Amino acid sequence: MYQTTTLKDKIKLFIIILLPILITQVSINLMSFFDTMMSGQFSARDLAGVAIGSSLWVPILTGINGIVLSITPIIAHLIGAKNKKDIPQVIQQGIYLSFVLSIIIIVIGGIALDPILQAMSLEKEVQRIAKYYLITLGTGIVPLFLFHTIRSFMDGLGQTRSSMIIILISLPINAVLNYILIFGKFGIPAFGGIGAGIATSLTYWIISGISIFMIHRVYPFHSYKVFQKILPPTLSYWADQLKIGLPIGLAIFFETSIFSAVTLLMSEYNTNTIAAHQAAMNFASLLYMLPLSVGMALTIAVGFEVGAKRLHDAKRYTYLGIMGGLFIAIFAGIILYTFDDVVARLYNSNPEVIELTKQFIIFAIFYQLADAIGAPIQGALRGYKDVNMTLVIALISYWIIGLPTGYLLANYTALEPFGYWVGIIVGLSTGAIALLARLLFIQKKSV
């Protein structure tokens, strides 16, 4: 990051920061896309099993990742204030904390997984696939959150291109491993959807190893000497990170878990409906990476300017990002509407699944438009280190307004499963309006 004076320079710098983040986020999500798409080509049951497994995993992944992402604004503020000496301490404590959180997830998952799956109305085979998909995926949790901690350090320095390179290296590896393990190639048995979990876990270990190598050997990361002196765990640093990260993580968890709750509630419908819902949701999640990336870039840009006490510049970056995110979402919606049949056929060849997927896609277009406003604003608020009210807004919008609305529409109107998607759209739209009001309040207060 560096100081800019004109709008043209701000746009140029913002694009430089945004593009690597966007490519990285899309590439990370492509792993889930490959898991779902290739499992669906194996069978509708495998698609449904991976869908249920993903619906349980994604809220945990994104929630914990939100806590880890708190390192990005902390680093951005330190760089903006020209305080580099505290960076190694922040990174090491972040790694300790991510390890502890990973172990907690593994323990809770080991205890709760079977009871949760057994409480759902699933075919036995779908339940088995979901269980072992999650178990195999879980073997990569520790390296995954180690990578995200190091990535947050890289992004906080404005070096977003480096994390992009790591993911781009790993993406074809993940696709090849999926192909081998799902369909059974080169003498290895076909694992179906479970093979997707194995492949993704192996990929997590690979990207973790590459990231460790880069901060040791690649400029400018090695100049910070992050591991030159190993420091003991310090609870006060954990508390500082959790103070920012926990509200971020919980806010993201409340948003992503509503989609998971909808998938779980849909277990009462047949396998084809579950498969079609997950196919549409999976592709919509891929599109969500666009506004999410804008939000992450705003966290860096706004955090840097706020750290340097240039509040007017922080405000200009904020509205630049919001308008950019909305433009991208409108363009993506047009593409999705035009090529709905092509998208549906990526996931399954069953005619019923294809037609249901196309119907779900119509609702997905409106869902991602609402997210295009909310996600960038959340990113800007993180740059201001304003995270607590975001948590409250997420809880009320998604769980008190969105999900009950969806449940009522699904069970008491002719919309049936599509009613849940209308509820999601209502929740996201409510959240976006509330977040905008909060942003205006913070900016006025900061003047």
UniProtKB/Swiss-Prot annotation:
User: Which UniProt key words apply to this protein?
Assistant: Antiport, Cell membrane, Ion transport, Membrane, Transmembrane, Transmembrane helix, Transport
Give one Pfam family, short name only: MatE
- The domain of life is Bacteria
- Main site of residence? membrane
Q: InterPro entries attached here?
A: MATE_fam, MATE_MdtK, MdtK-like
**BP GO annotations:** monoatomic ion transport
Annotated membrane topology: Multi-pass membrane protein
Q: Does the keyword Ion transport apply?
A: yes
Q: Give Gene Ontology CC terms.
A: plasma membrane
Which GO MF terms does the UniProt record name? antiporter activity; xenobiotic transmembrane transporter activity
Q: Transmembrane ranges?
A: 11-33, 53-75, 95-117, 132-154, 161-183, 193-215, 244-266, 286-308, 317-339, 359-381, 388-410, 420-442
Q: Where in the cell is it found?
A: Cell membrane
Q: Which PANTHER family match?
A: FMN_FAD EXPORTER YEEO-RELATED (PTHR43298:SF2), MULTIDRUG RESISTANCE PROTEIN NORM-RELATED (PTHR43298)
UniProt similarity note: Belongs to the multi antimicrobial extrusion (MATE) (TC 2.A.66.1) family.
Instruction: State what this protein does.
Output: Multidrug efflux pump.
- Name of the protein described by the UniProt record: Probable multidrug resistance protein NorM
Lineage of the source organism?
Answer: Bacteria, Bacillati, Bacillota, Bacilli, Bacillales
Q: Which gene is transcribed and translated to give this protein?
A: norM
